[in-house]
Amino acid sequence: MSDKMKTYPVVDVKTHHPEMKSYYFRQIEEQILPGQFFNLWLPGVDEKPFSVSDVYQGIMEITIKAVGPFTRAFMNVKRGDRIGIRGPFGRGFTMHQHSLLIGGGMGIVPLRYLARNLREKGFHFEVILGGRTEKDIPFTTEFSEWAPTTLVTEDGSLGYLGLVTQHIHEIIGRSKLSHIYSSGPEGMLVRVMEEASGRGLDYEISFERYMKCGIGICGQCVVDGSGIRLCKEGPVLNREEAEKVTEWGMVHRDGAGRRERED
Amino acid sequence: MSLCMKPDISVSFLNKTMSSPLVLASGVLGLTADSMKRVLEAGAGAVTTKSFSMDPRKGHPCPSILPYDGGLLNAVGLSNPGVAEMNKEIRKLQTQHNGLIFASVFGRTPEEFGSAAASAAESEPDLIEVNVSCPNVESEFGTPFGASFRDVEKITTIVKKAAGSIPVSIKLTIHCPSISKMARVCEESGADAVTAINTVGPGMLVDTGVMKPVLANKVGGVSGPAIFPLALKAVWEITGTVRLPVIATGGVTTTDHALQMIMAGAALVSIGSAVYYEELDVFSKINKGLTDWMTERKIGNLQEIRGKAHE
């Protein structure tokens, strides 16, 4: 793991659409687990955590959607520009047979690298992905090639009309899946936890909180109820860990450390 | 002591008993009750909150905390959700653990230090630590308050009055004409303890790839093992000058560091950056290290070695 700041050139950029791009870097660490994240520093702007969307043949991919000042500035990054990279940080997903991958929006990103790992192990898994519109669901081609994949959009522009959470029940029942992986908007994650707990299924979920140091000392990403540092013991938590946390779906903290209501 | 007796690492501090002389230093894992509870459970005798001000502060953009070869560089910029939030966390922690809680406060003016301390006193922490020495925030004259005898005297007097019955420790910096004279000023102004030292510098790092400073704030306070000898000398100098108890902090990472601080006269030993190097285990490791060392040297109580380096 590289905690210290070092910049690396972008070796390639792929434009999914003008507001979502993948940036490719030389693989800086031997072992990068799906669900782990890197802190990316855009010199002169800020530094933010991003999970890995893929590691393949010595190249690692980070996929970013323009949602705020930092990610909008990132859309101007070109091949050859240098980006500061620290990591990989945190704990990733562990490998399980017969799983369902449930992803929403940009939460789909870490599941893509997870899917590659499950596939390489020859494990059986199914996938359900949701987004507001077709544009908000990345990597549909890869997922569909690798596993039975259900797509859901809120406007019906791709797959079923509605929400991911309306379809989980049926898929689990039909395919006898025993493990759930999930990442996405927290409202969705809370529903996934309820569904999994109701069925007595184990799960691993990648959560998101405002992070600063990435190395477990600043305390910014500690979640209530547990003292769990999401940058260190997370961002992927298993059922036992996630159930200790009392703030899911209710509050999160901003950069000053203020508690804000979850949208 | 009799051979079969286990040495006692508990200490008495301002008429309160602590299970260990180790304290979580301000700025590390000190934002919420659950975070600090975890540190107390890991073996700290007390925890210090992150520094809080009357009004919430956003702090500096990131990168704001970076490891380098000899320690950490930080310019978090005193981000905090305001003293009222801190009080809620302290109240919550008091119901969950009986470890001591030190509330760290700061202000932009001496008067703001006073109102922050008055507000913090409402949650009845065991100590109010006054951060007059953060290198990232300056007085209106462009220097940290901790560099000026007059500012420290003024702030100590105001805070002591505002804190009522809650004891007050002033956190000092080595970046002043004389840290022992500064401690004397604190003592004469009514402080109950001093904390020494704050981060050193500020310092900086440049990324040679983009040829720019890496901290968003460009410069930041230096902590970690690199500053241990500076902190130790400051503690030794202060305890040779004033009778106030000293909370020693600055690069303490090992049992040997903690022993050196106590031998230099420290009442308590704070740990911050070492959480990065040794994880939360650092507290139980040093507690055990102290116990083992005392057993070997047939020492029953830390009081027996406190200040020995002065003799």
Language model segments and positions:
Chain A
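Short, Lys/Arg- and Gly-enriched loop/turn segments at beta-strand edges
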Residues: 46-53, 90-97, 101, 231
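Ferredoxin-reductase
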Residues: 2-79
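Short Fe-S-cluster ligation motifs
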Residues: 224, 228-233, 237-263
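FNR/FR-type flavoprotein reductase catalytic core
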Residues: 69-212
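Local cysteine-cluster metal-coordination motifs and their immediate loop/turn environment
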Residues: 186, 208-235
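Structural signal for conserved beta-strand scaffold positions within catalytic alpha/beta enzyme cores
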Residues: 12, 54, 151-153, 205, ...
